[in-house]
Amino acid sequence: MRLLGLDPGLRITGWGVIEVTGNRIGHVADGVVRSDDRLSLAARLAQLHGGIVAVLKAYEPVEAAVEETFVNRNPASTLKLGQARGAVMLAPALAGLVVAEYQPSVVKKAVVGTGGAAKDQVGMMIRTLLPGATLETADAADALAIAICHAHYRAGALSLALARAGGGR
């Protein structure tokens, strides 16, 4: 099963695709979609959306996951990030994919083991878990981490559902 992780940003949106087979996770592809800061906000959002649509067509994931937005000190920046996140999430949603959302601390804990991990720790762990991943940027590493987090949580939810269905009340 292919899963897409997305790390939204207005300037750079990271994406990563993994293949999950049983309890094995493999790297498929990763990269970034960049928007041109000389363009209007609407045009930049369209660039991000179009880039993610292209990723969906190229790699055909069956589910997607995205990091939740944190609120920073600058309300205008937070608003723009939220708009970018919406444009990015819209692409898999319109393609009929489930789009899961995870807090940054949950993603870090799932991949590194601690919710307060630094970006370089996340990148190092991604390189360990996914040998051969090129990791164009930290944004791509974060996107792969989000996909891995979703794979872990999805597997846990599936195990719980199977246990309940089997009479494990």
Curated annotation (Swiss-Prot):
Active-site residues from the entry: 7, 67, 139
Major place of residence: cytoplasm
Molecular-function GO terms, alphabetical: crossover junction DNA endonuclease activity; DNA binding; magnesium ion binding
Gene Ontology cellular component terms for the protein in this record: cytoplasm; Holliday junction resolvase complex
Keywords, sorted A to Z: Cytoplasm, DNA damage, DNA recombination, DNA repair, DNA-binding, Endonuclease, Hydrolase, Magnesium, Metal-binding, Nuclease
Coiled coil: none
Cofactor(s) this protein cannot do without: Mg(2+)
Localisation: Cytoplasm
Task of the protein: The RuvA-RuvB-RuvC complex processes Holliday junction (HJ) DNA during genetic recombination and DNA repair. Endonuclease that resolves HJ intermediates. Cleaves cruciform DNA by making single-stranded nicks across the HJ at symmetrical positions within the homologous arms, yielding a 5'-phosphate and a 3'-hydroxyl group; requires a central core of homology in the junction. The consensus cleavage sequence is 5'-(A/T)TT(C/G)-3'. Cleavage occurs on the 3'-side of the TT dinucleotide at the point of strand exchange.
Protein name: Crossover junction endodeoxyribonuclease RuvC
